[in-house]
UniProtKB/Swiss-Prot annotation:
Gene Ontology terms: cellular component: cytoplasm
Site (Important for dimerization): H180
Binding annotation for substrate: S97, N113, F114, R115, G263, G264, R265
Oxidoreductase found in the keyword field: yes
Catalyses which reaction(s): coproporphyrinogen III + O2 + 2 H(+) = protoporphyrinogen IX + 2 CO2 + 2 H2O
Enzyme class at the top of the EC tree: oxidoreductase
Primary location group: cytoplasm
Co-factor requirement: a divalent metal cation
Molecular function GO terms recorded: coproporphyrinogen oxidase activity; metal ion binding; protein homodimerization activity
Subunit comment: Homodimer.
Function: Involved in the heme biosynthesis. Catalyzes the aerobic oxidative decarboxylation of propionate groups of rings A and B of coproporphyrinogen-III to yield the vinyl groups in protoporphyrinogen-IX.
Active site: H111 (proton donor)
Name of the molecule in the record: Oxygen-dependent coproporphyrinogen-III oxidase
Length: 310
């Protein structure tokens, strides 16, 4: 059983590191000259990771694509919130986390995460599961972008059954929600936890299909919007809306909590935060403006796959 457990860890790690390489190459191609800077880190008796960060780029103001492989004698509370029966279990976990904060306000911020856990009190019967997904946070909405994003996500999910996309889409809408603001973080995507309902091979295949679909979902949006003209008004609104991103990640995000509770590398964990942000107390958008449309037409639950258009 120990060999089988290690084989799973090795197999998932190989894929996630390869995906990290492919994602970084794709974003560097969009940038032209800027490159991700790599930092290797280790936690004594706890694993380590490979952090890649791109800052002050032409297209990407700040973006991180991180891989980590960690282990410990006890799962942090963030990993056992829904399943207290496994608290106290020794564990191994691998994950890839991506957050891109573009410079142009018309390019949405994007987040993706793919992770694998294996835990148990002994080697005889370890419990394993996958989690992750991806979600999109626009500042200025375009229906064709939202439709494309969700259709790619649905196409990836449909290979595993037509019930998968609506289930994980709804979970994403539920998870990325700021309760204290009574609004979603963005237009959603896919989110899932505790995926082990199929055999390991099929669950892992789902992760790979989803990971491989990410660039198809996001790059065309970035390419179409990165040269869109904008001014100070759009930039200020982008910085204001980034505040919601900060609030969610620090108040609600379980991945952030897991990393901090585990004692991982803080700089890598907080790479999800934007480099610049503003808060404006009691600010409201001008009625009928592009900014108001974000709240009225995009920060609402919608069946984006069925939105009319070519």
């Amino acid at each position: 059983m120990r060999k089988d457990r290690q084989n799973k860890i090795t197999e998932v790690g190989i894929y996630l590191k390869d995906l990290q390489n492919r994602l970084c190459r794709a974003f560097e191609k969009e940038e032209g000259e800027s490159r991700f800077q790599e930092t290797l880190w280790e936690k004594p008796n706890g694993g380590g990771g490979r952090t890649r960060l791109l800052t002050e780029g032409h297209v990407i103001e700040q973006g991180g694509v991180n891989f980590s492989c960690v282990y410990g004698n006890q799962l942090p509370p963030a990993a056992t919130q829904k399943h207290p029966e496994i608290s106290g279990f020794a564990f191994q976990a691998e994950g890839l986390s991506l957050v891109i904060h573009p410079r142009n306000p018309y390019v949405p911020t994007v987040h993706a995460n793919f992770r694998f856990f294996i835990a148990g009190k002994d080697e005889a019967d370890p419990r394993w599961w996958f989690g992750g997904g991806y979600d999109l946070t626009p500042y200025y909405g375009f229906e064709e972008d939202c439709r494309h994003w969700h259709r790619v996500a649905k196409k990836a999910c449909d290979r595993f059954g037509e019930a998968i996309y609506p289930r994980f889409k709804a979970a994403c809408d539920d998870y990325f929600y700021l309760k204290h603001r009574n609004e979603p973080r963005g237009i959603g995507g896919l989110f899932f936890d505790d995926l082990n309902e199929w055999e390991f091979k099929r669950c892992f295949e789902f992760i790979k299909i989803l990971g491989d679909s990410f660039l198809e979902a996001y790059l065309p949006i970035m390419q179409n919007r990165k040269n869109h003209p904008y001014g100070e008004r759009q930039r200020e609104f982008q910085l204001y809306r980034r505040g919601r991103y900060v609030e969610f990640n620090l108040l609600y995000d379980r991945g952030t909590r897991f990393g901090l509770e585990f004692g991982g590398r803080t700089e890598s964990i907080l790479m999800s935060l934007p480099p610049r942000v503003v808060w404006r107390p009691n600010w409201e958008p001008e009625p009928g403006s592009e900014e108001a449309r974000l709240y009225e037409d995009y920060l609402v639950r919608r069946n984006w796959v069925s939105v009319s258009g070519a």
